[in-house]
C-alpha cells in the first residue's frame, strides 16, 4: 500500500513524463511528429537513427502518453497524442534560448548561416535540379 499522498503521486507522474522527455532523440522524434503522422521507418531516416532505436524511443513516448500509434499493414504510424505536446516543446525551446548561453549561440549561428543563402525562383531551382547542381 502506497503512503504517497495525491500531490506526491501527481508530481511523480509529472516527473515520469519529464524523464521520458529527457532524451535528445525523443525530442527530435517529437519535433518530426509535430509536422504530421509518420512511420517508424520515416522517423528513423529523418533522425538518422536505426529503425530499432527509433522504435524503442517511440515506445517510451507512447507509454508516457505522449504519442498515439496505429497499424496499417506492416507499418506502424505515430502521431502526437494532442496539441499540448507541441506547446511543451515550444516552451522547452523558449526556456533554453533565454537561459542557456550555448543554445542561444547555436541558434544565432544557425540563423546567421541562413542569411548567407541565396534565394532562387522555382524556375531556377528546377534548372539546378535538372543540371545536377
Spans of model-derived segments:
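Beta-hairpin "wing" of winged helix-turn-helix
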Residues: 62-72, 79
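Amphipathic alpha-helical dimerization/coiled-coil segments
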Residues: 1-12, 87-131
Amino acid at each position: 500500500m502506497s503512503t504517497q499522498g495525491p500531490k506526491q503521486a501527481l508530481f511523480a507522474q509529472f516527473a515520469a513524463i519529464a524523464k521520458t522527455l529527457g532524451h535528445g532523440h525523443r525530442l527530435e522524434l517529437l519535433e518530426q511528429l509535430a509536422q504530421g503522422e509518420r512511420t517508424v521507418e520515416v522517423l528513423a531516416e529523418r533522425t538518422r537513427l536505426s529503425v530499432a532505436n527509433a522504435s524503442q524511443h517511440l515506445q517510451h513516448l507512447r507509454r508516457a502518453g505522449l504519442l498515439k500509434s496505429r497499424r496499417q499493414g506492416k507499418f506502424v504510424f505515430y502521431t502526437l497524442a494532442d496539441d499540448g505536446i507541441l506547446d511543451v516543446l515550444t516552451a522547452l525551446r523558449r526556456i533554453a534560448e533565454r537561459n542557456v548561453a550555448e543554445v542561444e549561440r547555436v541558434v544565432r549561428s544557425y540563423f546567421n548561416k541562413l542569411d548567407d543563402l541565396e534565394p532562387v525562383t522555382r524556375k531556377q531551382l528546377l534548372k539546378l535540379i535538372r543540371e545536377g547542381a
